[in-house]
Amino acid sequence: MDQKAYIDQAAEHFRALLTEQLNRQARMSQGSPAKDFSRMERIVIGLIPGDGIGPILMAQARRVLEKLLAAELACGRVELRDIEGLTIENRTAQGKAIPDEVLAAIKDCDVLLKGPTETPKGGTLESANVAMRRELDLYANVRPVSVPELGIDWTFFRENTEGEYALGSRGVEVPGMLSMDFKVTTDAGTRRIARAAFDFARANGKTNVA
């Protein structure tokens, strides 16, 4: 292809990305209510073993959950549901970061406990974690850090569905000459992660937000 053809192809690609992200911005601006688990009659916890040592870890995690939630499991308030198929073998065979049947099973759950998943080196298969964040709109990455002897009690809120992660694998390339990746930051996305951090601070008696 000549230079003009590459430019035309990239322009069409960018048009599609921009349209997609503007539509996403519009959906976020409308907002959606969060689940109130205290009002739910039944909570389904999905368990995804993943790859490598994931099944070993998940077996022990299940033991802990069964102990901690014994009363809730006995009365049917909570269900532990195994979700199979999010393995490197199945994802590679289907050519999808999250196979359709696995994604459907995930969306039927209220809470998800997931083991580690491997991302193949090379190729174009997206990380299952990144795909899951996008498909389920898991925008808030919440990381608490506590070191009492140093007086540290911090909670970090990181936007999980924007930045380089969102579009980093969907750039454009002119073979042998250049490649470009994209980063997305929306007004609605910025506002909601900031709001989540402030709401957390208010609910937990925190007085400093930075």
Predicted feature residues:
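Glycine-rich phosphate/diphosphate-binding loop of Rossmann-like nucleotide-binding domains
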Residues: 46-62, 68, 175-210
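Structural signal for hydrophobic packing residues in well-ordered secondary-structure cores
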Residues: 18, 22, 61, 65-73, ...
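N-terminal phosphate-binding or glycine-rich loops at protein starts, especially the Walker A/P-loop
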Residues: 3, 7-29, 33-81
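Short, ordered loop/turn segments at secondary-structure junctions
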Residues: 50-52, 85, 117
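General structural feature for long, well-ordered alpha-helical segments within catalytic domains
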Residues: 2-6, 10-14, 49, 57-65, ...
